[in-house]
């Protein structure tokens, strides 16, 4: 498949988007939304804020059910693959932050070129007419 995009970047919802891009040879680097569960409005807000507070510990909440899972309460993101349940957050946050800083900087640099964004549209949250809230947001913006 020939395309005119320099980059094809996952905007997430869940990990499978990046996995499928990789499976078909369309993913050339790791980006911030690849391996997490992400709220679409949170993704847009995070990009507009240039990833400020992405891993700010003030907004990180550890799951009671699975101690490896953390939620960013500002952007409504869930990190499932980055943390070790046997270490306290403060001992592992620097390493995770460095990884996401590289990915965020790569993202902001990459989107200056021709970029195709791919996102799985969640239908888990619907309005009273049974239409996906994410799809409505996209249509309205």
Where are these regions (language model features)?
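Extracellular glycan-modifying ectodomains
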Residues: 1-141
């Amino acid at each position: 498949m020939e395309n005119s995009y320099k980059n094809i970047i996952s905007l997430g919802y869940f990990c499978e988007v990046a996995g499928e891009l990789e499976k078909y040879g369309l993913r050339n680097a790791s980006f911030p939304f690849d391996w997490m569960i992400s709220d679409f409005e949170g993704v847009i807000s995070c990009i507009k804020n240039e990833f400020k507070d992405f891993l700010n510990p003030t907004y990180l909440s550890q799951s009671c059910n699975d101690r490896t899972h953390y939620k960013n309460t500002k952007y409504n993101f869930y990190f499932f693959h980055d943390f070790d349940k046997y270490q306290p957050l403060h001992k592992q946050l620097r390493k995770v932050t460095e990884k996401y800083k590289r990915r965020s900087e790569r993202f902001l640099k990459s989107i200056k070129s021709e970029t195709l964004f791919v996102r799985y549209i969640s239908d888990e949250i619907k309005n009273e007419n049974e239409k996906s809230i994410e799809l409505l947001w996209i249509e309205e913006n």
